[in-house]
Amino acid sequence: MERLIDLLHSGEYSCVMMSRKTVYTFVQRGVADLYDLYQSDPGFMKGASVADKVVGKAAAALMVLGKVGEVYADVISTPALALLREAHIDVAFRQEVPFIENREKSGWCPLESACYRLKSVAEMYPVIRDFIAGIRMKKTFAGVLLACVLGGTAVQAKAQSDTARIARNVVMDEVVVTGTRHETDIRHLPMTVSVVNRSQIEKRYEPSLLPVLTEQVPGFFTTSRGMMGYGVSTGAAGGMSLRGVGGSPTTGLLVLIDGHPQYMGLMGHPIADAYQSMLAERVEVLRGPASVLYGSNAMGGVVNIVTRKQQEDVVNTGVQLGAGSYGTLQTEVSNRVKKGRFSSVVTGSYNRSDGHRADMGFEQYGGYAKLGYDLAEGWKLAGDANVTHYNASNPGEVDEPRFDNDSRITRGMASLALENRSDRMSGALSFFYNWGRHRINDGYLAGEEPQKSRFNSKDRMLGVSWFQSAVLFSGNRLTAGFDYQHFGGESWNKAVATGEQQPGVDKRMNEFAGYVDFRQDIGSWLSLDAGVRVDYHSHVGTEFIPQGGLAFHLPRNSELKAMVSKGFRNPTIREMYMFPPQNPDLRPERLMNYELSFSQRMLGGALYYGVNLYYIDGDNLIVTDRSLRKNVNSGTVENWGAEAVAAYRINPVWHVSANYSWLHMRHPVVAAPEQKLFVGADFTQGRWSVSTGVQYVKGLYTAVSPERETTEEFVLWNVRGCFRLCPHVRLFAKGENLLAQRYEINAGYPMPKATFTGGVNIHF
């Protein structure tokens, strides 16, 4: 129901209804859409979830007749609420009113008045039927009269208008915030956004979000080195790439949590171990540059983690305990509450693994809390905080072992946001603060002496973000925003013997940016989008970033989209001031992305497929010039490729999906496979739920230096399943790499062969 409510508010919908994973959206005011659906497909209504902006007694009567399962209403009348509760239908609402007003706000709604004294839905139905018939008779007569005067033009226009209002089948994942800042139907956006929902995340039984993204998002890849954990510094995994853009460390791909940037203030890259499954309601991955809305680092795309929330008045508590191969333990506790205007989410986790190699242990613990309060209709105050600490060990490459390479990392984040949302406007003013404390022993190789000092750092990033989106006129949406970021930190080396500190770098920088995005629907067949951002960096200066695109809404639930966008990345403090080959004169990296995509839904929304073609051309990339022994802006990127996705819900029991990406890189980089294919199937019946998937990776570069160039090819087969022991307890198990493939993702770090994990989920 939470996603259904989000969909209701994402566009100009009056009502949305979900049944058997298929969603109908409606735009007509009043009860005409509900009446038509009850006439044409009453079976769809049975047991359905409904989210409606206004529910009066007549609408409630149609819902009772259709035997819907649950209802949410922004506004509901007292008679409607009583009727639904009398029929034992679960109801949640934002505001209860004595009666529904007419459109002029001068008195009762005619149907509300006509049904007010009627006791049964059997009495109300003929009243509703006759009322709608009378309204339509008047419209038909007016249309015929006008057609006689204008030669039939009015009749054609009326027919087109009615066609545009026909309920369309959509899926819940089509409502996104990443491409526009505000909630939007993805069909109106020219960019491509992949959505991984909570159900997909939970079926993985993984503490980290990155493995499920690697499976489900074409063109996205994450490096790995073992059962659990990614680490930092020497030998670290967790490098992310999208369409061959990202880097190692990942500076060309931006990670967000609820739209706020997440990266280490000194190094400028995300910390992979901080992005845990317990945080996410869903993850939205924008494939392609998103610098207009999010600025630096969003060159290759954006991974936006949308945190969990509670929409309905209920208390949910969950406990997950699991154990598996190589001393692996994963635990999680969560509690979600909604009571009146107050809501909260609190989660905690502890995870550990010995690893499949000696000296490869990993341990992590942390917690997350989010509080929200509805100040008034359309206004909400929300704040959250997340702290995680982990200890990671790196054994080095198998042919060159490393000893005592241990890291102790603590990361934290907090934010406070004031949000507003109405039918025509939405926006937010938010403050965010991220910080980190790193302690690293770089270790030593065989024959070397142990390190005499330890690397230490403190970093922070804080900022203010404001945006406001408004509908100025029909089919229009204008979004304007301002971002401010302050980031940096300090580093030092601390002697083991004496405790003496040798200063490293102590730098702080600022960014200011303003942006505007304009979207206009032209009729029912075209959406036009254009945006621009002006970004000022306190060291490198000003960058101008444009983007534009078209989305054609074609017959038979198909969409054709074209997009041109610019991405950029400012140099990091590490690249300019830390460690040789630093260079303070570096300039921003830049690229242009050209993209064409087509998608279609068929068989009543049960079948979906989409294809993307793209070309990326960039220059000024920061690379190390060995002859000069410093970083310079001499690198280039020229990538092109294709991506495809497909999903088919065969019946309520079986669901299959697949995605494929092909990438050609003129200048190959590590951690970006040339081909990646995933094929999966989900089975759900009775107490059983089982999912399986096969992933094929080819042309994965693990080394691209002049002295050494290596690639990997492998096939992974994974199976996961759960059994509902009783209403509150589920047993789960998973097996990964069941073909026992021998392969490497990080050069010199062989991955484990077949591994197994099992455990229990308790919900109450």
Question: Where are the regions that the model predicts?
Answer:
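Conserved C-terminal beta-signal and adjacent last beta-strands/turns
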Residues: A159, G372-L375, A562, H655-V656, ...
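Extracytoplasmic beta-strand/coil segments of soluble accessory domains associated
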Residues: T214-H260
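Short acidic/polar hinge/loop motifs at secondary-structure boundaries
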Residues: H260-R287
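Short strand-turn segments of transmembrane beta-barrel domains in outer membranes
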Residues: V302, T307-R336, G348, S353-M360
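Flexible loop and strand-edge segments within Gram-negative outer membrane beta-barrel domains
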Residues: S353-M360, Q364, D374, G378-M461
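Structural signature of Gram-negative outer-membrane beta-barrels, strongest in the C-terminal barrel
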Residues: A376, F473-R477, Q502-D617, N651-P652, ...
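Outer-membrane beta-barrel signature, preferentially recognizing the C-terminal barrel domain
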Residues: V398-R421, S457, K507-M509, N557-E559, ...
